[in-house]
Amino acid sequence: MEPIKNLPRLCRTLGYEFNNIELLIQALTHRSAANKHNERLEFLGDSILSIAISDALYHQFPKATEGDLSRMRATLVKGDTLTIIAKEFKLGDYLYLGPGELKSGGFRRESILADAVEAIIGAVYLDADIEVCRKLLLSWYQERLAEIKPGINQKDPKTILQEYLQGFKKPLPDYQVVAVEGEAHDQTFTVECKISELDKVVTGVASSRRKAEQLAAAQVLELLNK
């Protein structure tokens, strides 16, 4: 757990500065750690995320059917996606957990990470308003919204790889940014993807970290399918 003094660093990562930092602390507090925990904020954030993503998809895909919109929304708000977002934000470093959860590695537990993302959404809403929260969510989901398309199969390479490894009870992939080149407005990211099933390290290179991770995951899947 990072000290409270380092929460401004998390705020910069999230792209939002809290007026009331206590709301962020509560959003990061698991029920095992204190009576004032994040479950109510999680409840609030879940609803806000759903309406924000529904609204974005409705306007982005004016010809999509209700079924396609529902499937795309489910892909974007499901626990696996929220867990990936949490790991991108390194939320596990900031969680307040009780001794039992801490000992059992709760800071890596996917359900706890996903719940913390929803709790932070609820905290932002209470700290500001629905419009500020909506704009923040759109910034978090910008690349995912750009990539998603109507259709039955909504799974991206990272999700497919994660589910494949989970099915065999194997460790999740380890993604590491090994190089960032270029100016701030025109950067190139190189990401390594390591899994226990392969001896070799696979890399992806793209204009964003997320895209590079997706490319690396896609290459790993190709190797696994050979």
UniProtKB/Swiss-Prot annotation:
The first-level EC class reads hydrolase
Q: Which Pfam families match?
A: dsrm (PF00035), Ribonucleas_3_3 (PF14622)
Q: Which CDD domains match?
A: DSRM_RNAse_III_family (cd10845), RIBOc (cd00593)
Q: Gene behind this chain?
A: rnc
**SUPFAM superfamilies on file:** dsRNA-binding domain-like, RNase III domain-like
What is the organism of origin for this protein? Shewanella frigidimarina (strain NCIMB 400)
Domain RNase III as annotated: residue spans: 7-129
- Give the main location: cytoplasm
Name of this protein: Ribonuclease 3
One Gene Ontology MF term: metal ion binding
The question of whether Metal-binding is a record keyword is answered with yes
Annotated signal sequence is: none
**GO CC annotation terms, alphabetical:** cytoplasm
What are the binding positions for Mg(2+) in this chain?
42, 115, 118
Its subunit composition reads: Homodimer.
